[in-house]
Amino acid sequence: MFTLKKSLLLLFFLGTINLSLCEQERDAEEERRDGTDESDVEVEKRFLPALAGIAGLLGKIFGK
């Protein structure tokens, strides 16, 4: 009976550690996903003024 209790305690302990590691990994993935949204906004901010500049340049060229 003591051996059974010892084995169950060991399984519970290992399971708890496994769940903790999975939770940390999930949190890290969520942080990475949140970080990419911010970088997408930065890329968009850099891209739109360049696009507007090109459109203005083309308007001057073809407007003559």
From Swiss-Prot:
Alphabetical keyword list: Amidation, Amphibian defense peptide, Antibiotic, Antimicrobial, Cleavage on pair of basic residues, Cytolysis, Fungicide, Hemolysis, Immunity, Innate immunity, Membrane, Secreted, Signal, Target cell membrane, Target membrane
A GO CC annotation given for this chain: other organism cell membrane
Regions that span the bilayer: none
Compartment(s) where it occurs, according to its Swiss-Prot or TrEMBL record: Secreted; Target cell membrane
Main location, first listed in the record: secreted
Signal peptide: 1-22
Propeptide: 23-46
Classification via Pfam families: FSAP_sig_propep
Function: Non-amphipathic mildly cationic alpha-helical antimicrobial peptide with potent activity against Gram-positive and Gram-negative bacteria, and some fungi, as well as against Trypanosoma and Leishmania (both promastigote and amastigote forms). Strongly and selectively perturbs anionic bilayer membranes by interacting with the polar head groups and acyl region of the phospholipids, with formation of regions of two coexisting phases, one phase rich in peptide and the other lipid-rich. Shows low hemolytic activity and a low toxicity for human monocytes THP-1 and THP-1-derived macrophages.
Homology family: Belongs to the frog skin active peptide (FSAP) family. Temporin subfamily.
Protein name: Temporin-SHe
Species, as recorded: Pelophylax saharicus
